[in-house]
Amino acid sequence: MSGAKEVRTKIKSVQNTQKITKAMEMVAASKMRRAQERMEATRPYAQKMRQVIGHLAGANPDYRHPFLEEREKVERVGLVVISTDRGLCGGLNVNLFKSVLQQMREWDKQGVGVDFCTFGAKAAAFFGRLGASTLADTRGLGDTPHLEDMIGPIKVMLDAYTEGKIDRLYLVHNDFVNTMSQEAATRRLLPVEPVDEEEMLENWDYIYEPSASELLDDVLMRYIESQVYQGVVENVACEMAARMVAMKSATDNAGEIIDNLQLVYNKARQAAITQELSEIVAGANAV
């Protein structure tokens, strides 16, 4: 019966693991719903900010803000990469890093260098091993990120752009499509892309105090911050969705392993009982 005992021990071990993965699945599902609510709450703010920028720029067309002007030559670009701090979320980070590596190869073909600003321990570790140029690194934002913790690294990248160290700035993060699907997305932060006429839903005829140019300086800064914050919040929702799916898959796989081990255990136990009966019958016949 020693073989049956070993199988029984394995079954108990897998059952304990299954309880853990099931609990993690339920926790991730709860956190995902809260992250989705935050994500949906921040989207209208970012969209309205684009409208405000378009109206302010239109109110003073002679004012050329550096965040709105295309540069003739692009020698270096900055990538703000948002990953997770923890694992157990399937291929979420791997797919994101593959997208970044592809972009790096494309920029390298054009002779353009890349500087990084990373959010999340996974991105910091990956690009650290890669030996990439990292200007700012932030970790430990948690499941409920706060904008105050992001302002520092954002300012580092904005200063690099203002000083001409980088000529474009991009945001790379996971885009929440639905619970089962998350995709790596890249959006240009600087220079800010022109606002489409469709986004300018209303004609504003305001007198600005202070001037439109002064307001534009502050609004552009807030816009960049809101875009990064939106990316971080959306990435949290992606992380929780991916972890929920990964843990559900692990729980289901554990169930299959338990079923297979139970079958092995039953066969081993049946074989042991059959052997004992055979020995008893043989002993009785001998007597």
Curated annotation (Swiss-Prot):
CDD domains: F1-ATPase_gamma (cd12151). The keyword Mitochondrion does not apply. It is a peripheral membrane protein. Its main location: membrane. Keywords: ATP synthesis, Cell inner membrane, Cell membrane, CF(1), Hydrogen ion transport, Ion transport, Membrane, Transport. It is found in: Cell inner membrane. InterPro entries: ATP_synth_F1_ATPase_gsu, ATP_synth_F1_gsu, ATP_synth_F1_gsu_CS. GO terms for molecular function: ATP binding; proton-transporting ATP synthase activity, rotational mechanism. Pfam families: ATP-synt. SUPFAM superfamilies: ATP synthase (F1-ATPase), gamma subunit. GO terms for biological process: proton motive force-driven plasma membrane ATP synthesis. GO terms for cellular component: plasma membrane; proton-transporting ATP synthase complex. Belongs to the ATPase gamma chain family. Produces ATP from ADP in the presence of a proton gradient across the membrane. The gamma chain is believed to be important in regulating ATPase activity and the flow of protons through the CF(0) complex. HAMAP family: ATP_synth_gamma_bact. F-type ATPases have 2 components, CF(1) - the catalytic core - and CF(0) - the membrane proton channel. CF(1) has five subunits: alpha(3), beta(3), gamma(1), delta(1), epsilon(1). CF(0) has three main subunits: a, b and c. This is ATP synthase gamma chain. It comes from Alkalilimnicola ehrlichii (strain ATCC BAA-1101 / DSM 17681 / MLHE-1).
